[in-house]
Regions:
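Conserved catalytic-site region of short-chain dehydrogenase/reductase
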Residues: 83-84, 119-133, 144-150, 175-179
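N-terminal Rossmann NAD(P)H-binding glycine-rich loop of SDR-like oxidoreductase domains
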Residues: 3-23
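C-terminal substrate-binding subdomain of Rossmann-fold SDR/epimerase-dehydratase oxidoreductases
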Residues: 18, 30-32, 193-317
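Rossmann-fold cofactor-recognition segment
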Residues: 45-59
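Conserved beta-loop-beta element that borders a ligand/cofactor-binding pocket
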Residues: 116, 122, 154-178, 187-190, ...
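NAD(P)H-binding glycine-rich loop region in Rossmannoid oxidoreductase-like domains
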Residues: 55-95
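Conserved Rossmann-fold NAD(P)-dependent oxidoreductase catalytic core, especially the SDR/UDP-sugar
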Residues: 76, 102-142
Length: 317
């Protein structure tokens, strides 16, 4: 089975590639803006059995050439993924999350391919609510990132309903892995605890009272594998385990036997321009669509412990 992972150098691209690599009947191609940088990154994480293809997702001629190879599955993971940064990079966020996706859908329609297309969406597409979220919940994003993801969500759905393409939306809640960029909250928390342990360093944070479902990326990718064999639809992939930033912070510092209050400070420069205080999923309703027997194994303190051990072992600070 031929798989194309668009934007394959991020945590989802790397994680899904590693899983598919273990299966004998999958051939994986990854698109990237920089062959040399991505090759070095994949080598670092022990990912060898993939082919790299240079691609500008805004260039439809390049996409046409690539898709003429007739892939069985296409995973669209490209895109600027920071809600906070999206306020500063509005055009880049829109181009990468929406226009690139639009180009792929239009070329798939033009070639009349039977390919299954998976668009990575986000919990940021929903409105601010205390209710548990399912795929039909009200959608009203508050950031350019969320708006760009909602545009691609709606377009992916449109191409499925009107043009009968085999298109899927994968609505992903917060995800963590060894490959996650260190600027995000959970890696920052883990690294702050390590720095406090090693050198008594104090780290500045924004608001830590936000509540999220932090997932382990590999578990979400295993759910994606389940979705691959479902009828084209829209799915929420999250574990239903909610924790505040403070809870995750306490897990990290307690693990290293430290009092976090001595090593963190609140700094307004880290506040997001706009943010949701709470994001939680209607886990049982969502998971029944994918695999009713599935249960998460890695969440909460387990995520924190895994990351700290990995960072310490690989001397990442």
């Amino acid at each position: 089975m031929k798989c194309l992972i668009v934007g394959g150098s991020g945590q989802f691209g790397i994680t899904l590639s590693k899983i598919l690599n273990k299966r004998k009947n999958y051939k994986i191609d990854i698109t990237t803006r920089s062959i040399s940088k991505t090759k070095s990154k994949l080598k670092k994480y022990g990912l060898k059995k993939v082919r790299l293809i240079k691609l500008n997702i805004l260039n439809k001629n390049q996409i046409l050439k690539i898709l003429s190879k007739k892939y069985d599955y296409i995973f669209y993971f490209a895109g600027q993924s920071s809600p906070d940064l999206s306020f500063k990079k509005i055009n880049q966020t829109l181009e990468s999350n929406y226009l690139g996706c639009k180009n792929f859908l239009e070329i798939l329609k033009y070639l009349n391919l039977n390919t299954k297309f998976f668009n990575s969406s986000s919990s940021e597409i929903f409105s601010d609510t205390k209710k548990k979220l399912n795929i039909f919940s009200k959608k009203k994003p508050i950031s350019p990132y969320g708006r760009s993801k909602l545009l691609s969500f709606n377009l992916t759905k449109k191409f499925r309903k009107i043009y009968k393409l085999k298109t899927y939306n994968l609505v992903l809640f917060n995800s963590e892995s060894y490959f996650r960029e260190k600027k995000y909250l959970i890696p920052k928390i883990c690294l702050a605890a390590i720095k406090a342990k090693n050198s008594n360093k104090i780290t500045g944070f924004g608001k830590l009272d936000v509540i999220r479902e932090w997932n382990w990326c590999e578990e979400q990718c295993n759910l994606i594998l389940n979705c691959m064999f479902k009828k084209p639809n829209d799915f929420i992939l999250s574990n239903g385990k909610e924790y505040s930033g403070y809870q995750m912070l306490k897990y990290a510092f307690n693990y290293l036997k430290l009092d976090y209050k001595k090593y963190i400070k609140n700094e307004k420069k880290f506040y997001r321009k706009k943010d949701f205080k709470l994001k939680r999923s209607d886990f049982r309703k969502n998971i029944n669509q994918i695999n009713p027997s599935w249960k998460p194994k890695i969440y909460g303190k387990i995520i924190i412990y895994k990351l700290i051990k990995y960072y310490q072992k690989n001397k990442i600070v």
